[in-house]
Curated annotation (Swiss-Prot):
UniProt record similarity statement: Belongs to the peptidase S16 family.
Originating species: Caenorhabditis elegans
Single GO MF descriptor: serine-type endopeptidase activity
Function: ATP-dependent serine protease that mediates the selective degradation of misfolded and unassembled polypeptides in the peroxisomal matrix. Necessary for type 2 peroxisome targeting signal (PTS2)-containing protein processing and facilitates peroxisome matrix protein import.
Active site: residue positions: S672, K715
Organism phylogeny: Eukaryota, Metazoa, Ecdysozoa, Nematoda, Chromadorea
EC number: 3.4.21.53
Protein name in the entry: Lon protease homolog 2, peroxisomal
SUPFAM superfamilies: P-loop containing nucleoside triphosphate hydrolases (SSF52540), Ribosomal protein S5 domain 2-like (SSF54211)
Length: 773
């Protein structure tokens, strides 16, 4: 359709952005009037999609010059039941508008100014600036348009196209240019703005920083510096890296392929991304180890309470690294319940060595490619987590934490655990192959540390490569110290509260631990301390806001006292005080015994209940018991049947026995309940109740021997938390018991038993510790 004067065209009113002839613009449609115009005139099937872009400069005024535009694309979509539109338009002509009666207007005059320019100096400046813009254009199409206008000497249109790329110009400046009278005026304005903004970064085309060629201001031609393209910059980075011969041949072969490719080829970007990854990896960058054992001991002592055995083992490891000047062959694995400081002690190791710390979470990973990357032939292929982490930390010898290594899963996509074998094997990891990188990378300088909650879930081959360091839960005394020395300070700092404003009494900490937490670590305890700090912050803020002009706090008692008596008012509905098993089940009937078990979150007391009824000696088990636990019941029953006459115990041969372990929804398994099951059956046979203040743990044999078990400290701490005072342990676990803190050993009456007879005797007599209480 030919645009003529006195035509009536639909109007789109805009308040930002100016469409110049020859330029394109995307216009989001927001106003109801514009939406009505589009739905009335543009949504119909028609090839004559022309509009007038009018510019609203104030509430009641529209600029006298508008732009006639062709609607190239119309986008429409629905969001929250509302229809939205967007227009892609191309500027055609300037136009004076008359009789603006929305939604249409009458075009009174079409302005196509392209007069000849007599000022040769101005032409030279304009052409030079336009060529610079074209040389750094993001598209070939735009460059061709620039050179086409130069060849055709369409200097007015050339000025329009150049100004359309100047993002630094404001709305009113662009309107002034749109309404300028004559080509000379527009060219002069274009040159003026070019000279004012000599930094090419101000253009929408985002010219690289290295281009310092400003537009000429004195009429003289200046030499435009050579702008290095992306491939040349990449080659410079690669030349600065010392590769091995094998890697160097592969890298430069791929670089040569890249240079011979056209940028439009599909493999160009894939190869470019691969080379950029290669150039960004720390092939030769290492941090210098600064291992001072005295400094390391200080860091470990200040950052962690208790765990003396663990800290000593870490110091031994650091001493070997210092003597050897190498970390090859030693991969530590901290195992224990959540929240006891496995990750933080790994950070302390990195700090004491002067190395960077990098953590990779492996929890829930099922795909081998997450570890070793995807092959480059796949769409959206990317390197594995190991290579990505090295790219992030920018050094090839960080302390690398493989967190939650026991949470790896095997599936149809391969075994992530198996993928770790090459990474953790000192004989192989000097040539670690990531599928995406596909060239050997030396990870032997990395100090690997793993963490796990349940070491039994690790595959044997992976476990064989790890040096296991067991970390147990904290006692009440240790938790109190941790809260006073670490948690409280951290939470006060986080909430911007001075130590002078709050005092957390020790008894309040004890109350939080005993009544609000049930954990081996201190995570829930820290959350409770955070809740107290938030309450204190609220009280302080309310006091300050009571008088906005006050420079000091109003009269209030400082520090704010947090005691055992008022802590329940602060934590409120977070109060989850549990009824202790001892109090709930006292007095114990015959056939009931307290056993001890250990889980990934710490130890717990496990009641064992047995009942009998007339029958034929059948055994019924309930409580979601595993195979090993069921076999322990049979062993205990077999020992009782074989020794009842010798020991003068009752018999259960003509009785049906029902054994139940409460919390039926929880899986239970393991051999350590053997002694507890034997005690429950003996109590049932003799009709004599067992002690209600004692718990027992240990595996039994058919000949009556008590065999060692694991998790001694966690089980003793669980008994202590529940108010039990006597614990019967296997004699074989005496060494683990003696390593426990003296305050725990003095508070608890621990009996070491070698046979089932010893266990039964300890579970039925009086406790000397209980007598003192």
């Amino acid at each position: 359709m030919k645009i003529e004067e006195n035509m009536e065209l639909p109007v789109i009113l805009v308040t930002s952005g100016v469409l110049l002839p020859g330029a394109s613009l995307k216009i989001p449609i927001r106003s109801k009037l514009n939406i009505q115009t589009i739905e009335k005139y543009l949504t119909r099937s028609s090839n004559d999609n022309y509009v007038v872009i009018a510019y609203k400069v104030s509430t009641d005024k529209v600029y006298e010059v508008a732009t006639i535009a062709y609607v190239e694309k119309l986008f429409g979509w629905t969001f929250n039941s509302t229809v939205h539109y967007s227009l892609d338009v191309i500027g055609l002509h300037r136009a004076n508008i008359d009789k603006l009666s929305l939604p249409t207007c009458i075009v009174s005059k079409v302005v196509d100014l392209n007069e000849a320019i007599s000022n040769q100096n101005a032409i030279e400046k304009l052409v030079t600036g336009a060529k610079i813009i074209a040389s750094n254009s993001l598209t070939d199409k735009f460059s061709r348009e620039i050179y086409s206008l130069i060849d055709e000497k369409e200097y007015g249109k050339l000025a329009d196209l150049c100004v359309s790329q100047m993002k630094f110009l404001g709305f009113m400046q662009l309107l002034e240019f749109l309404g300028a009278n004559g080509t000379d005026a527009r060219v002069e304005m274009c040159i003026k703005w070019m000279n004012e903004k000599k930094d090419a970064n101000t253009l929408k085309l985002k010219v690289p920083n290295s281009l310092e060629a400003s537009f000429p201001v004195d009429g003289k031609k200046r030499k435009i510096p050579n702008v290095k393209n992306q491939v040349e910059q990449l080659e410079e980075k690669l030349n600065a890296i010392e590769f091995s011969d094998e890697v160097s041949d592969r890298v430069y072969s791929e670089l040569h392929r890249l240079k011979s490719m056209n940028a439009q080829q599909s493999e160009y970007n894939i190869l470019m991304n691969w080379l950029e990854l290669v150039s960004s990896l720390p092939w030769n960058t290492s941090t210098i180890d600064d291992i001072e054992l005295h400094k390391a001991r200080t860091i470990l002592t200040e950052s962690h309470e208790a765990m003396d055995d663990v800290k000593e083992r870490v110091l031994e490891h650091l001493a070997v690294c210092k003597m050897n000047n190498s970390v090859k062959g030693m991969i530590l694995c901290f195992t224990g319940p959540p929240g006891i400081g496995k990750t933080s002690i790994a950070k302390a190791i990195a700090e004491s060595m002067g190395r960077k710390f990098q953590r990779v979470s492996l929890g829930g990973i099922r795909d081998e490619s997450d570890i070793r990357g995807h092959r480059r032939t796949y769409v959206a292929a990317m390197p594995g987590r190991i290579i990505e982490a090295l790219k992030t930390c920018k050094t090839n010898n960080p302390v690398f934490l493989l967190d939650e290594v026991d949470k790896l899963y095997s599936g149809n996509q391969g075994s992530p655990s198996a993928a770790l074998l090459e990474l953790l094997d000192p004989e192989q990891n000097s040539t670690f192959h990531d599928h995406y990188l596909n060239i050997p990378f030396d990870v032997s300088k990395i100090m690997f540390i793993a963490t796990a909650n349940d070491i039994d879930r690790l595959e044997p081959a992976l476990r064989d490569r790890l040096e296991i360091i067991e970390m147990s839960g904290y006692s009440l005394k240790e938790k109190v110290k941790i809260c006073e020395n670490h948690l409280l300070t951290r939470q006060l700092t986080k909430h911007c509260i001075s130590h002078d404003y709050v005092k957390l009494e020790r008894q309040a900490i004890v109350a939080m631990i005993e009544e609000y937490t049930m954990e081996a670590g201190v995570r829930q305890l820290e959350r409770n301390v955070g809740a107290i700090c938030r309450n204190v912050a609220l009280r302080l803020a309310e006091a300050l806001n009571s008088d906005p002009g006050a420079d000091v706090l109003p009269v209030m008692e400082l520090p704010i006292q947090i005691s055992a008596s008022n802590i329940h008012k602060i934590l409120k509905n977070k109060h989850m005080k549990r009824v202790k098993i001892v109090e709930k089940m006292r007095p114990l009937p015959a056939g009931v015994c307290f056993g001890l078990s250990v889980t990934t979150i710490g130890g717990r007391v496990m009641p064992i209940e047995a009942s009998k009824s007339k029958g034929t000696g059948k055994i019924v088990t309930t409580g979601h018991l595993g195979k090993v636990l069921k076999e322990s019941i049979l062993v205990a029953k077999g020992w009782l049947s074989a020794n009842s006459e010798r020991l003068g115990l009752g018999t259960l041969e003509d009785q049906d026995i029902h054994v139940h372990l409460p919390a039926g929804a929880v899986n239970k398994d393991g051999p350590s309940a053997g002694t507890g099951l034997a005690c429950a059956l003996v109590s049932l046979a003799t009709n004599i109740p067992l002690r209600s203040d004692a718990a027992v743990t240990g595996e039994i044999s058919l000949t009556g021997h008590v065999l060692p078990i694991g998790g001694v400290k966690e089980k003793v701490l669980a008994a202590q938390r529940e108010g039990l005072r006597r614990v019967v342990l296997p004699k074989s676990n005496e060494e683990e018991y003696l390593k426990m803190d003296e305050d725990i050993r003095l508070e608890m009456d621990v009996v070491l038993a070698e046979t089932i007879e010893d266990v039964i005797g300890a579970m039925m007599d009086k406790s000397p510790v209980l007598a003192k209480l």
